[in-house]
UniProtKB/Swiss-Prot annotation:
Subcellular location(s) per record: Nucleus
Keyword terms of this UniProt record: Activator, Chromatin regulator, Developmental protein, DNA-binding, Nucleus, Phosphoprotein, Repressor, Transcription, Transcription regulation
Protein name: Hepatocyte nuclear factor 3-alpha
Phenotype of null mutants: The prostate shows a severely altered ductal pattern that resembles primitive epithelial cords surrounded by thick stromal layers; no differentiated or mature luminal epithelial cells are found. Dehydration and electrolyte imbalance, development of mild nephrogenic diabetes insipidus. Severe hypoglycemia due to at least in part diminished expression of GCG. Mice deficient for Fox1a and deficient for Foxa2 in the endoderm from 8.5 dpc onwards do not show hepatic bud formation.
MF (Gene Ontology): chromatin binding; DNA binding; DNA-binding transcription factor activity; protein domain specific binding; RNA polymerase II cis-regulatory region sequence-specific DNA binding; sequence-specific DNA binding
DNA-binding stretch(es), residue numbering of this chain: 169-260
Gene Ontology CC terms: fibrillar center; microvillus; nucleoplasm; nucleus
Residues the record lists as Phosphoserine modifications: 303, 327
Name of the gene: Foxa1
Compositional bias per record (Gly residues), positions renumbered to this chain: 273-285
A biological process from GO: hormone metabolic process
């Protein structure tokens, strides 16, 4: 090992103010100078001289306690600094300065152990570097007995708070059982709601806490079970609240007086005269009264509007006949537009056909050259069956709910949009195609060619609708 260590960045006079020795270089103590009593430590003044001492594994209780009890050691003395010293060297360390022991510890060279005297070498080699784990002073379990005792002392007081005595446990009775017991023990066999609460709290201390929760459950049990009947107060018993009693037909719901489990659920079949039962009977009659409008005897269920929704007319025009008032209009339009096939339109086979023009939004009409049986080839082109958004004559469609001007404006806008987006279709449109809001006033002089199937095929064809 080097004999001297050069300190950098300081002059000699600076170090003189820190240390008593005026030397700038600090010499190391040879291992041979260390005898069994470690007497050579009396002359050590530096903090780099203990580098031959080995690890802190060989700490004895005497040396550990000495580090805190010896007043001659300075503030820089640590338990690791005196780890390699046996108890016999405690007196020899009194002359060491505070800075002379700060570097003693685990990083020191273990090679100096062989040159030490018999007593220190034997002590250090015998214990080895693992002695710290065996030393009770350094082991974490050294404080285990006191910690365990403290935890037992603290847990003894907490055990009483978690342990619940048997009288305060929740009783194994349902709320119906509690109400039945309270009513049956009363002399008059009926109690008010507050009296039922009081009886339960007097008998079962568990229900003296969280009163709002279980009292709500008591009220629900009284209201929703037919075995409990509300009895109005008599004039000779003034007070607040009605009485509750057991239904006379409920019988013995609990077998052999055991209230742990009900034998059967009581269901009141007939309407009793009591207030609680009449409320239940009124609720039963409610669904029947709601079913009457949809019953078979209701004429609205058999109206043409109801029948036409599921018929063939929903596929052709998307709307049945609105009512009997529209039938004259249907006949007039049939005679005006379908003169050649009027008799065929009135036949039973085509009796379910809708009106040809029953509203302002009706665009599809049968031309004179086509008879009634000619609707089938153009069914997929004109009327777009299966597309509910464009069945304009549906009675509940948005077109029939709108005014004629708004409806025409909507159709004009759709035709204008399609003419811009789909040029092949817009190029084949006739010149009379209404484009713009000005066509509202000039709607009547539409040419007959605009009503041809090819016109509607170009405007409202399947590819256009699917992409919109």
């Amino acid at each position: 090992m080097l004999g001297t260590v050069k300190m950098e960045g300081h002059e000699s006079n600076d170090w003189n103010s820190y240390y008593a020795d005026t030397q700038e270089a600090y010499s190391s103590v040879p291992v041979s100078n260390m005898n069994s009593g470690l007497g050579s430590m009396n002359s050590m003044n530096t903090y780099m001289t203990m580098n031959t001492m080995t690890t802190s594994g060989n700490m004895t209780p005497a040396s550990f306690n000495m580090s805190y009890a010896n007043t001659g050691l300075g503030a820089g003395l640590s338990p690791g600094a005196v780890a390699g010293m046996p108890g016999a060297s405690a007196g020899a360390m009194n002359s060491m300065t505070a800075a002379g022991v700060t570097a003693m510890g685990t990083a020191l060279s273990p090679g100096g152990m062989g040159s030490m005297g018999a007593q220190p070498a034997t002590s250090m080699n015998g214990l080895g570097p693992y002695a710290a784990a065996m030393n009770p002073c350094m082991s974490p379990m050294a404080y285990a007995p006191s910690n365990l005792g403290r935890s037992r002392a603290g847990g003894g007081g907490d055990a009483k708070t978690f342990k619940r005595s048997y009288p305060h446990a929740k009783p194994p009775y349902s709320y119906i059982s509690l109400i039945t017991m309270a009513i049956q023990q009363a002399p008059s066999k009926m109690l008010t709601l507050s009296e039922i609460y009081q009886w339960i709290m007097d008998l079962f201390p568990y229900y003296r806490q969280n009163q709002q929760r279980w009292q709500n459950s008591i009220r629900h049990s009284l209201s929703f079970n037919d075995c409990f009947v509300k009895v109005a107060r008599s004039p000779d018993k003034p007070g607040k609240g009605s009485y509750w009693t057991l239904h006379p037909d409920s019988g013995n719901m609990f077998e052999n007086g055991c209230y742990l489990r009900r034998q059967k659920r009581f269901k009141c079949e007939k309407q009793p005269g009591a207030g609680g039962g009449s409320g239940g009977g009124g609720s039963k009659g409610g669904p029947e009264s709601r079913k009457d409008p949809s019953g078979p005897g209701n004429p609205s269920a058999e109206s043409p509007l109801h029948r036409g929704v599921h018929g063939k007319a929903s596929q052709l025009e998307g709307a049945p006949a609105p009512g009997p008032a529209a039938s004259p209009q249907t006949l007039d339009h049939s005679g005006a537009t379908a003169t050649g096939g009027a008799s065929e339109l009135k036949s039973p086979a085509s009796s379910s056909a809708p009106p040809i023009s029953s509203g302002p939004g009706a665009l599809a009409s049968v031309p004179p050259s086509h008879p009634a049986h000619g609707l089938a080839p153009h069914e997929s082109q004109l009327h777009l069956k299966g597309d509910p958004h464009y069945s304009f004559n549906h009675p509940f469609s948005i077109n029939n709910l709108m005014s004629s001007s708004e409806q025409q404006h909507k159709l004009d806008f759709k035709a204008y949009e399609q003419a811009l987006q789909y040029s092949p279709y817009g190029a084949t449109l006739p010149a009379s195609l209404p484009l713009g809001s000005a066509s509202v006033a000039t709607r009547s002089p539409i040419e007959p060619s605009a009503l041809e199937p090819a016109y509607y095929q170009g405007v409202y064809s399947r590819p256009v609708l699917n992409t919109s």
